Structure formats: C-alpha cells, structure tokens
Design a protein with these regions (language model features):
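Class I SAM-dependent methyltransferase SAM/SAH-binding core
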Residues: 25-28, 32-79
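A short SAM/SAH-binding and catalytic strip from SAM-dependent methyltransferases
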Residues: 88-101
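Conserved alpha-helix/loop element of class I SAM-dependent methyltransferases that forms part
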Residues: 5-25, 35-39
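C-terminal lobe and adjacent flexible extensions of AdoMet/dcAdoMet transferase-like proteins
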Residues: 186-196
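C-terminal alpha-helical "lid/dimerization" subdomain adjacent to the S-adenosyl-L-methionine
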Residues: 2-9, 122-183
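Short glycine-centered segments of the SAM/dcSAM-binding site in methyltransferase folds
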Residues: 45, 116-118
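A short glycine-rich, Lys/Arg-flanked "PGG" loop and its adjoining helix->strand segment in the class I
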Residues: 103-115
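A short acidic, Gly/Pro-enriched loop at the edge of an enzyme's catalytic core
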Residues: 78-90
Length: 196
C-alpha cells in the first residue's frame, strides 16, 4: 500500500489530533515557543523542556497565557531533570530529529514515564532507500544540523522508538507535499512505554 500523500493543513490537523490524546502529567520535550498549547486537553498538568533560551522565554510567557503553572525547564531531552516515573505522557513534535543522541533521549523519556505511559511523537523521517529524497536528505543534513537547531533530516525515528522499547498504538507514515525535491516523509507515533 502506498504511503498517503497529504498537504500541510492536513498534517497540522493530524498533529493536533495526536497531541490532544495525552492526559494527566504531560512532559513536552523541545517545547519550542508553545506551538502545541492549543492542542492539549485543558486539564493536562503540563511541563515543558526547552534548551534554547530565546524560545524558552517565549514558552514561559505563553505557558502563563494558557494557565500552565510550571516554569519551562532549561534542559535537553538526553538529561531530563525530573524524577523516575513522574509523568503520564511525553510529547515531542519535530524534536527527535534534532536531539544529539536519540537513544539517550528516548531512554530518558522511558525513565520519567510511568510504566505503560503514553508517548506522542511527530517528526520528519528518513526517506526510502534509493530515492531522490533520500539523496537530498544525505546531502542536506550536515548543513541542516548547523542552521536548523541540530536537525537531522535522515533519521529512522520509528526504528529508534522500537529499539527504545515503545510499542506503537497508532503509527502513521505519511508524505507531505513539498517542493522542489518532492514529498517529505513523516511519522506520527502514538505509543506506550513497557509495563502497562
């Protein structure tokens, strides 16, 4: 079966749908400047993690506007300053592409999640082998890492999630229309940590 091809608006709707699923104590890693606040259920107890000082300042302002009590944490996903089993869910949109070490970040996510906790990740991912898009990703990634907050356009994020022990409940592989080098492969992953 062919991977569905969608446009940016359809992707935005799916992102909001996936983020809206989380409940309870929620950690958002790489929370940026708060783009996901409108998608969260109003009853979540939100905590954000953002290593970039400029984004974190904007995030703090927006968190107050959305009535979230927590102050965003200055930390990277590879070293989350929270106790073991302290959150019910972890959300990351366009963040696993830019962490320094995916395996270390996902190990930290597992550590802070309660057993059976939920993970929701949305990210662009590695294109299929022997495609123009895969070639473009290989050429562009060294540049993107320097100018796009460490972004790797060529990561196999789904495999990293599986290797970290997460089980997909709703996993969608999509392609988003893009020019000039063709559609961007995307992954939407709603899953669980071990121990449910």
């Amino acid at each position: 079966m062919a991977t569905p091809l969608i446009d940016d608006d359809e992707l935005d709707d799916l992102e909001r749908e996936f983020v809206a699923r989380v409940r309870g104590r929620v950690l958002e890693i790489g929370a940026g400047d708060g783009e996901n606040f409108g998608a969260f259920d109003p009853d979540v107890e939100w905590q954000g993690l953002e290593p970039d000082a400029t984004r974190r300042a904007e995030l703090a302002t927006r968190a107050k506007e959305w009535r979230h009590a927590a102050v965003p944490l200055d930390a990277k996903a590879e070293s989350i300053p929270l106790p073991d089993h302290s959150v019910d869910a972890v959300v990351g949109t366009y963040v696993l592409c830019s962490v320094t070490d995916q395996a270390a970040a996902l190990a930290e996510v597992r550590r802070v999640l309660v057993p059976g906790g939920r993970v929701v990740f949305v990210d662009h991912v590695q294109a299929p082998p022997r495609t123009l898009k895969r070639f473009v990703q290989a050429v562009a990634t060294p540049i993107a890492k320097r100018v796009c907050h460490g972004c790797h356009w060529d990561r196999d994020t789904e495999q990293a999630l599986v290797e970290a022990g997460f089980t997909g409940v709703d996993v969608r592989r999509l392609r988003v229309r893009s020019m000039p080098f063709g559609p961007v492969p995307m992954l939407l992953f709603d899953g669980r940590a071990p121990g449910a």
